[in-house]
C-alpha cells in the first residue's frame, strides 16, 4: 500500500507528539467488529489503538466493540457513513454495492497466492481501491488479508456438480450471489451472526469463509465438510467515518494513518498463526478438510471467471484489475 508518511518513523512520531502537545481534548474512537475479542481483526485494531495513543501522547485512543455489539457489518457501514460511529473493520464484500472498486479483490481466482495478494493490495493498485471510498463517506485506512474463502457443507465439494441443490449463505453482495450461482449453488444472503442457526436448522445447507472464521463461529459443528475451493481472497477493510475525519487536525489524521499502517505486520503474524491453529482445531473437532489438490479448480475457474467482465464496471476498474494481474 502506498502510505504518505516520511520514511523515518521515529521522526514522524516525534513530529506528531509535538503537534499534540498543544492539541485539543482527548478522543476515544469507537470501532465496530462482528468477531470476538481474540480474533485477529479485533486484536489488530486494539494494537492500532495502542500505537495511536503513543503517537498522540495519550490524547487519542480506540475502543473496539466486537461480537456484533454495534450491529451487523451492513449496519456498521451505514453508521460509519453518517458518523454515528467512528470506524469499523468490515469484510470487503459489504462495500460492494456502495464502492464499485471494492468488488475487485473479490473477483474469483484473481490472486495467485497470499504473496501476490500482499504485493498488489499494499501497492498502487490497492491504494486506488482505498482512495475510492472517500467519495462514499468513508476513509479506507488499510486492508487486512482474510485468507482464501472456501465452501463448507454437510458433504464435500469437488466440482460444480457437487454444488447443485445446495443453499449457500452469502454476504449481501451481487458479486457474491453471482459467484455461488456460477459455482452451481443457490445463493442465500444472510447476516453473519445468523449462519450457525441457519446451518443447524437447514435454512441454508452451506456457507463459505476462511478457516479462522469457520473455527471461531463453530460452523464446523453443523457443516463438517470444508472443501478448499479457495475461490476468492476478499480482504477486510478498516474504514473511518469521513464525517468525523474532516473534523480532525492534520496531525490526528496522520497519526491514525500511521497507526493503521503499523497494525498490518502485526495482523499478518496473528493471521498466519490463527490459520494454522484453526485448521488443527476444526480437525480435532470432527471436521473433514478436503485439500485444494482434490478440488477441480479448473472447472470452477471456467465457471466463475466470466464474472470479471460483468463486474469490471468502468475502464478504471479494468485498469486496476490489469495492474493486479501484472503484479509479480
Curated annotation (Swiss-Prot):
Subcellular location: Periplasm
Keyword Phosphoprotein: no
A single cellular component GO annotation: outer membrane-bounded periplasmic space
Keywords: Periplasm, Signal, Sugar transport, Transport
Pfam families, alphabetized: DctP (PF03480)
Disulfide pattern: none
Residues of the signal peptide: 1-26
GO term, biological process aspect, one: transmembrane transport
A GO molecular-function annotation: carbohydrate binding
UniProt binding sites for beta-D-glucuronate: 35, 73, 89, 149, 209, 236
InterPro entries in UniProt: DctP_fam, TRAP_DctP, TRAP_DctP_sf
UniProt: beta-D-galacturonate binding residues: 35, 73, 89, 149, 209, 236
Chief localization: periplasm
Function: Solute-binding protein that binds D-galacturonate and D-glucuronate (in vitro). Probably part of a tripartite ATP-independent periplasmic (TRAP) transport system that mediates solute transport into the cytoplasm.
Family: Belongs to the bacterial solute-binding protein 7 family.
Subunit description: The complex is comprised of an extracytoplasmic solute-binding protein and a heteromeric permease formed by two transmembrane proteins.
The protein, known as: Solute-binding protein Bamb_6123
Protein species of origin: Burkholderia ambifaria (strain ATCC BAA-244 / DSM 16087 / CCUG 44356 / LMG 19182 / AMMD) (Burkholderia cepacia (strain AMMD))
Amino acid at each position: 500500500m502506498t502510505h504518505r508518511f516520511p520514511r523515518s518513523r521515529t521522526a514522524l512520531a516525534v513530529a506528531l507528539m509535538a503537534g499534540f502537545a498543544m492539541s485539543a481534548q482527548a478522543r476515544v474512537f469507537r470501532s465496530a467488529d462482528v468477531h470476538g475479542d481474540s480474533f485477529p481483526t479485533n486484536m489488530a485494531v486494539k494494537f492500532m489503538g495502542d500505537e495511536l495513543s503513543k503517537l498522540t501522547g495519550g490524547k487519542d485512543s480506540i475502543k473496539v466493540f466486537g461480537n456484533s455489539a454495534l450491529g451487523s457489518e451492513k449496519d456498521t457501514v451505514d453508521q460509519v457513513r453518517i458518523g454515528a460511529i467512528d470506524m469499523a473493520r468490515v469484510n470487503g464484500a459489504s462495500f460492494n454495492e456502495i464502492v464499485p472498486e471494492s468488488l475487485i479483490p473479490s473477483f474469483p481466482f484473481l490472486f495467485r497466492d497470499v504473496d501476490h495478494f500482499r504485493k498488489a493490495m499494499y501497492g498502487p493498485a490497492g491504494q486506488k481501491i482505498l482512495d475510492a471510498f472517500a467519495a462514499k463517506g468513508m476513509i479506507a485506512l488499510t486492508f487486512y488479508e482474510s485468507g482464501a474463502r472456501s465452501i463448507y457443507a454437510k458433504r464435500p465439494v469437488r466440482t460444480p456438480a457437487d454444488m447443485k441443490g445446495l443453499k449457500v449463505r452469502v454476504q449481501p453482495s451481487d458479486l457474491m450471489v453471482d459467484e455461488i450461482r456460477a459455482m452451481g449453488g443457490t445463493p442465500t444472503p444472510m447476516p453473519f451472526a445468523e449462519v450457525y442457526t441457519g446451518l443447524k436448522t437447514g435454512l441454508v445447507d452451506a456457507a463459505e469463509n476462511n478457516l479462522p472464521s469457520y473455527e471461531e463461529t463453530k460452523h464446523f459443528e453443523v457443516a463438517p465438510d470444508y472443501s478448499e475451493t479457495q475461490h476468492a481472497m476478499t480482504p477486510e477493510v478498516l474504514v473511518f467515518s469521513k464525517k468525523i475525519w474532516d473534523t480532525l487536525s492534520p496531525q490526528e489524521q496522520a497519526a491514525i494513518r500511521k497507526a493503521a499502517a503499523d497494525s498490518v505486520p502485526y495482523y499478518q503474524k496473528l493471521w498466519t498463526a490463527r490459520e494454522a491453529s484453526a485448521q488443527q482445531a476444526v480437525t480435532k473437532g470432527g471436521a473433514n478438510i478436503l485439500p485444494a489438490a482434490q478440488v477441480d479448480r479448473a472447472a470452477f475457474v471456467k465457471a466463475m471467471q466470466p464474472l470479471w467482465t460483468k463486474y469490471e464496471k468502468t475502464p478504471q476498474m479494468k485498469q486496476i484489475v490489469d495492474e493486479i494481474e501484472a503484479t509479480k
